[in-house]
């Protein structure tokens, strides 16, 4: 099964929450140490976020994977830093995670 970029038009980006961009979520450690507000941990050359998937022979999405974004830190680091939680968990990580779970449960 080839790995393919999932387009923003896919239902996974709007089944519950309307997601209009593939958000870059830095690790909490990088974000705390970043003085210039960047979210790309390895510089400008890695600033493009990819959300990719694998589809079955009928075109159903089976696997979701992310690249150049640490979406899971937004799910697991909510009590460590209130600003990080508000900026990344509430606005970026949770909406995508909820959409992925709801999509998986309904398809």
Model-derived segments and spans:
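Extended, composition-driven regions rather than compact fold-specific motifs
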Residues: 1-107
